[in-house]
């Protein structure tokens, strides 16, 4: 089967949104998700869910969208000029979780499908997605676990998949104007349409389903750790990097805004509180300095597992 089944993809994505929201709400134990269904004037719509002011999660947004249009925006055709003049559909689930506790990392995941069509020509389609982790205070155990889950879900699809998509993630979530990584990476893939539709769909499902397996054990391990104002101030400062990346470099944000997407849903990825400080430098040998020294530089976390276990 190589003709895309959009109904199948949509059913999976809606179920994925349900499952992730249920797991996050259960882990929080205090706040619930509120849901807003919206319609896009140019075609399509979505289902946005957000949890705010929880006991564990300061803000967690989990979006489903299925938008369509008669013509692609500049952000989509810049690196694919052959798509100009085609109608399109884009489906996806995208989420960003900003915990309250600074010892809990921010996490992001996204799985999406895109198809561009023109009468008399073959449809052009692909899958994309991934997940990545942004700690404020790093724990080697968590980083290894995150990458172990990523590696394991990739294995059935080939030995080369994890290293390829890990590198793509490291390269993509790099804040060029800061010359530093946004976090410790994970997986990132795009333009996936080979060898056939079902293989690509199965891999995309593995990534989507892998997110909870990667993130929830970290939540369970760290959510009860005590923290104070020092940790909170550092978390708010580092959240600034998240804002900078999303507004300056992220293709998904630009695509959403250029296609007339729902601004509130697109910018739900931004943290509710953030701060900047001119020329901040962490204290030498501090826990804050360790983030820059031990976690943000790109490394092979699974090789570390082999050395320490």
Curated annotation (Swiss-Prot):
Gene: hemF
NCBIfam families xrefs: PRK05330.1
Active site: 108
Site features described as Important for dimerization, chain residue numbers: 177
Family annotation (PANTHER family): COPROPORPHYRINOGEN III OXIDASE, MITOCHONDRIAL, OXYGEN-DEPENDENT COPROPORPHYRINOGEN-III OXIDASE, MITOCHONDRIAL
Catalytic activity reported: coproporphyrinogen III + O2 + 2 H(+) = protoporphyrinogen IX + 2 CO2 + 2 H2O
Subunit structure as annotated in this protein's UniProt entry: Homodimer.
Keyword tags: Cytoplasm, Heme biosynthesis, Metal-binding, Oxidoreductase, Porphyrin biosynthesis
Annotated segments matching region Important for dimerization: 242-277
Known cofactor(s): a divalent metal cation
GO terms under biological process: protoporphyrinogen IX biosynthetic process
Residues annotated for a divalent metal cation binding in this entry: 98, 108, 147, 177
Family: Belongs to the aerobic coproporphyrinogen-III oxidase family.
Name the record gives this protein: Oxygen-dependent coproporphyrinogen-III oxidase
Location(s), subcellular: Cytoplasm
Primary location: cytoplasm
Tagged with keyword Membrane: no
